[in-house]
A protein has these predicted regions:
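A general alpha-helix detector
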Residues: 39-43, 61-64, 81, 99
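Acidic, PIN/NYN-like endoribonuclease modules and their adjacent C-terminal/linker elements
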Residues: 1, 97-128
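Short glycine/serine- and small hydrophobic-enriched flexible loop segments
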Residues: 42-49, 102
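Phosphate- and divalent-cation-binding pockets in alpha/beta enzyme and binding domains
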Residues: 21, 39, 81, 116-117
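Acidic catalytic patch
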Residues: 57-87
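Short active-site oxyanion
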Residues: 28-30, 70, 101-106
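Helix-loop-beta junctions that constitute the ligand-sensing/allosteric loops
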Residues: 90-92
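Short, well-structured N-terminal submotif of metal-dependent ribonuclease cores
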Residues: 1-35, 50-59, 112
Length: 128
């Protein structure tokens, strides 16, 4: 079981969705703070705006989000931990780290800066 962040999910959705590693990740129990959805939608919108993908592909990926086997956790239960972690992390990144801490799960990310900071608190897997 793992906590997945938006950078890892975007990597899977846009660049690597057919790879064996991604299929393996998506077949495991995954958790994320509810902020995963707006962060992922924002990244997909930006990718379309920058013409990295077409609007149709980005829209299809957004629709696919609701089908993913990811348990979303409301963020209000993470508020205090987010506050405490936000000295060294953005509040957004702290959402993922605090959830991984609470659940005692590995954090999956594609953000090397986040991974470096998060390793002080949880195990981290970086997508390559």
């Amino acid at each position: 079981m793992s906590v997945i962040d938006a950078s890892a999910l975007i990597e899977i959705l846009l660049k690597d969705e057919t790879a064996a590693k991604s299929r393996r990740l998506l077949s495991h129990d995954l958790f994320a703070p509810a902020i995963l959805i707006p962060e992922t939608v924002n990244a997909l919108k930006k990718s379309a705006r920058l013409k990295l993908v077409t609007k149709a592909i980005a829209r299809d990926k957004v629709a696919f989000l609701s089908l993913l086997p990811i348990d979303l956790v409301p963020m209000q239960r993470l508020s205090l931990e987010i506050w405490q972690l936000s000295d060294s992390l953005s509040a957004y990144d702290a959402c993922y780290v605090s959830l991984a801490m609470q659940l005692e799960h590995t954090l999956i990310t594609n953000d090397r800066r986040l991974a470096k900071e998060a390793r002080r608190f949880v195990d981290v897997t970086i997508l390559d």
